[in-house]
A protein has these predicted regions:
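Inward-facing hydrophobic residues that define packing positions of alpha-helical scaffold repeats
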Residues: 28, 99, 170-171, 178
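Active-site-adjacent bridging/hinge elements
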Residues: 1-3, 124-131, 196-203
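Extended ligand-binding clefts on enzyme/binding-domain cores
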Residues: 15-149, 160
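Active-site acid/base region of carbohydrate-active enzymes
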Residues: 1-19
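CBM-like carbohydrate-recognition segments
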Residues: 141-142, 176-211
Length: 211
């Protein structure tokens, strides 16, 4: 998937990931019929993608969504598949169901969590560990870092689909998350729960200010 890891515990076990399948499908669809000589070509050197390959990817993608994979029940990476930049899902009901699950399970005041029980860059993460056992992932529940990046994905999608009320709401939310550096408004990679309020955030998710 987009996070370049295997299962949720990062044991290296391979999984099919909707974000990878969706990007591959979108890429093949974009390449189909491409003239390698560009606008000056005569059609003698065009890429022809077997439609069966695209159909297999479509079935695999629709079979996974709204999940990202077997171990990740929801993942913000799927926003890039159901909207900008891939727009890889034709089924509008599946698009809405996937978006609704991501917003419900992963949404927060500072953006979206990558996936549930994600310990990446939390204050309790052990950076010397390459993976965690499934029962150890509970220590990250409720304190997963939140990423403004995914609000930007949704903003671009909303603008391209001319959903202006939603675009304005997302723009307002993003503006509040920007930080000034050298006179520029920048967005941090993520917001995390400070060490001194980890227990309070675990008990009451969304109650503590992040940094």
């Amino acid at each position: 998937g987009i996070w370049e890891r295997g299962d949720k515990g990062n044991h290296g076990l391979p999984e099919r990931n909707a974000s990878s399948i969706g990007m591959a499908k979108a890429a093949l669809e974009s390449l189909d019929g491409l003239d390698l000589y560009g606008p000056h070509g005569n059609g003698s050197c065009r890429l022809l993608i077997p439609q069966g390959a695209i159909s297999r990817l479509r079935r695999a993608l629709e079979g996974l969504l709204p999940r990202e994979s077997a171990s990740k029940e929801a993942d913000s990476a799927c926003l890039s598949v159901i909207g900008y930049p891939a727009w890889a899902v034709e089924n509008s009901k599946l698009v809405e169901r996937t978006a609704r699950r991501i917003r419900r399970e992963l949404g927060g005041a500072y953006g979206y969590k990558r996936f549930l029980r994600d310990g990446h860059q939390t204050v309790v993460e052990d950076v010397s560990r390459l993976h965690y056992e499934p029962e150890e992932l509970a220590q990250f529940e409720g304190i997963e870092s939140e990423w403004p990046l995914f609000l930007a994905f949704e903003l671009v999608t909303a603008c391209c689909e001319q959903r202006w009320d939603e675009a304005r709401r997302l723009q307002t939310q993003l503006k509040a998350l920007a930080v000034e550096k050298d006179g520029e408004q920048l967005y941090p990679e993520l917001y995390l729960v400070p060490e001194q309020v980890v227990e309070q955030e675990r008990q009451h998710p969304g109650s503590q200010a992040r940094i």
